């Protein structure tokens, strides 16, 4: 009988070490003096700088990127999907006013491809730089029998900090407040299962096909990274009181905005922005009902802020100074803790 090794059973420890070597330089770009120990150890060490805080509150979030992975897999392009992963986590941290501190990742694969994982982590590092947080560690798990060769999944975990008295939870939102929408970069990381079904099956589109309306291939459009809103919003928080914020993810504006509304108020949205072409294409190709579009996709608005009317112009001016398009898209009125969309 031949000797049996871990590698023969489907787990290549040497490939895992190769991944660490490949990603080290990218990860180190994200580190700051607060990181006492990053990748390579059993755990990461982060020294919380409480200067400027009276009662610092740690905020945590975890997320993934759903079936956007299938687009990356089909195209063999993995260098931007890590940006999406960071965006999904740090944008959620941001909704309560938290500054992201550090990020960790989990990558699970059927068969480890060091180059593929290195590309994934490269994107994560890029996202962390954009969010001004440190990529302090992660886990790469090779699991033959759980995943088929070529299949993989990723998850991200983030921690941020906010002053307790400055937590933004929507509790002060009242009738008369104004809703500001900040543009998305496209489909972001939600609704890809519906998009794939509508475009690739119903519409018979191909990911490599050039689409005139986009000026790029369909696959490139779908892989456009999720926008990270951290820097402009943290800057805005120093100038304007923000009463509530929502990251528009799965469920769209319809399901996400009510999460920050107090009882007895509702959000009335007027669609005065140009809905991105990708959503129009999905709707047409799949004959997707309009109500389903609004409950699945961001429809061009990736992040929402609620401010009092007197602060609207300053808020929009600040956001646009970072080259983030922003509009007044609605108002808060007395009502039933819901969203009403007027097209």
Swiss-Prot record:
Subcellular location: Cytoplasm
Any single biological process term in GO: 'de novo' IMP biosynthetic process
Catalytic activity: 2-formamido-N(1)-(5-O-phospho-beta-D-ribosyl)acetamidine + ATP = 5-amino-1-(5-phospho-beta-D-ribosyl)imidazole + ADP + phosphate + H(+)
Domain of life: Bacteria
SUPFAM superfamilies (alphabetical): PurM C-terminal domain-like, PurM N-terminal domain-like
GO cellular component: cytosol
Classification via Pfam families: AIRS, AIRS_C
EC number(s) on file: 6.3.3.1
Keywords: ATP-binding, Cytoplasm, Ligase, Nucleotide-binding, Purine biosynthesis
InterPro entries xrefs: PurM-like_C_dom, PurM-like_C_sf, PurM-like_N, PurM-like_N_sf, PurM_cligase
Gene Ontology MF terms: ATP binding; phosphoribosylamine-glycine ligase activity; phosphoribosylformylglycinamidine cyclo-ligase activity
Metabolic or biological pathway, per its Swiss-Prot or TrEMBL entry: Purine metabolism; IMP biosynthesis via de novo pathway; 5-amino-1-(5-phospho-D-ribosyl)imidazole from N(2)-formyl-N(1)-(5-phospho-D-ribosyl)glycinamide: step 2/2
Family designation: Belongs to the AIR synthase family.
Protein name from the UniProt record: Phosphoribosylformylglycinamidine cyclo-ligase
Organism: Carboxydothermus hydrogenoformans (strain ATCC BAA-161 / DSM 6008 / Z-2901)
């Amino acid at each position: 009988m031949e000797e049996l090794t871990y590698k023969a059973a489907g787990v290549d420890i040497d490939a895992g070490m190769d991944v660490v070597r490949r990603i080290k330089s990218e990860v180190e770009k994200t580190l700051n003096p607060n990181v006492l120990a990053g990748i390579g150890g059993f755990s990461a060490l982060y020294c919380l700088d409480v200067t400027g805080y009276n009662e610092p509150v740690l905020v945590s979030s975890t997320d993934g990127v759903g079936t956007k992975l299938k687009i990356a897999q089909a195209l063999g392009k993995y260098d931007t999907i890590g940006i999406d992963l960071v965006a999904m986590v740090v944008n959620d941290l941001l909704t309560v006013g938290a500054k992201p501190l550090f990020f960790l990742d989990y990558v699970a694969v059927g068969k480890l491809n060091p180059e593929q994982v290195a590309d994934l982590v490269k994107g994560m590092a890029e996202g962390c730089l954009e969010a001004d947080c440190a990529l302090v560690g992660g886990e790469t798990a090779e699991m033959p029998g759980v995943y088929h060769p070529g299949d993989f999944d990723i998850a991200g975990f983030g921690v941020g900090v906010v002053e307790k008295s400055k937590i933004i939870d929507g509790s002060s939102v009242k009738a008369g407040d104004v809703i500001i929408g900040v543009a998305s970069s496209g489909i972001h990381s939600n609704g890809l299962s519906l998009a794939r079904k509508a475009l690739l099956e119903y519409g018979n589109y191909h990911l490599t096909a050039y689409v005139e309306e986009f000026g790029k291939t369909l696959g490139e459009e779908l892989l456009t990274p999720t926008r990270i809103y951290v820097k402009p919003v943290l800057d805005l928080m120093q100038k304007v009181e923000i009463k509530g914020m929502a990251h528009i993810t799965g469920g769209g504006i319809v399901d996400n905005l009510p999460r920050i509304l107090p009882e007895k108020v509702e959000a009335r949205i007027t669609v005065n922005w140009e809905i991105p072409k990708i959503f129009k294409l999905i709707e047409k190709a799949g004959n997707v009902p309009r109500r389903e579009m609004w409950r699945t996709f961001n429809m061009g608005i990736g992040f929402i802020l609620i401010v009092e009317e007197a602060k609207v112009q300053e808020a929009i001016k600040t956001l646009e100074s970072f080259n983030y398009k922003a509009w007044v898209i609605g108002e808060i009125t007395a009502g039933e803790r819901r969203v009403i969309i007027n097209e």
